[in-house]
Amino acid sequence: MIPDMDPDQPTPTSPHAGPCSHHDHPRPAVPGVALHWCDEQAEIHRIVVGDFENNVFVLRCRQTGQSVLIDAANEHDKLLELCRALDVQSVLETHGHWDHIQAVPAVREAGYRVAVTADDAAMLPSYDDLLEDETVLEVGRLRLHTICTPGHTPG
């Protein structure tokens, strides 16, 4: 998933993109959360959870404050705290392996919608929405385009 951004602004892969000043972009008050990357339009926050040290990311629109959690891996208490701190609207699962989905029941119970590809949906204990290749999702004023890359899992 790649957010659409202003073509005149640096992208996450450009040499001009990088960590923002923490003075301009305060971190959420959640232990273990780091501001991984940002520019004028978006922030990416990262937390590492579980025994397998899974990376969980939150993409946040800087203009609206709305966010999406990427992979409800495990340690649901930490993830729910992060969701509340960063105004998460929904959860996107990158794939259905057990170490990326353990917190799905807890985040759904807390009211967050969970989306996954149809080919991996059966691997999740539950979900709300199916993602197709080239689905466009809005997170505030950002647009995410899904790209299905089967191989690691079916979807």
Map each language-model feature to its residues.
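Short acidic/polar alpha-helix capping motifs at helix-coil junctions
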Residues: 19-22, 41-48, 67-70, 97-101, ...
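Conserved beta-strand hairpin/beta-sheet module of binuclear metal-dependent hydrolase folds
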Residues: 32-86
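Core dinuclear metal-dependent hydrolase active-site scaffold
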Residues: 36, 46-47, 57-58, 134-155
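Active-site HxH/HxHxD metal-binding segment of metal-dependent hydrolases
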Residues: 53, 67, 74-145
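Glycine-rich His-Gly loop
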Residues: 61, 96, 151
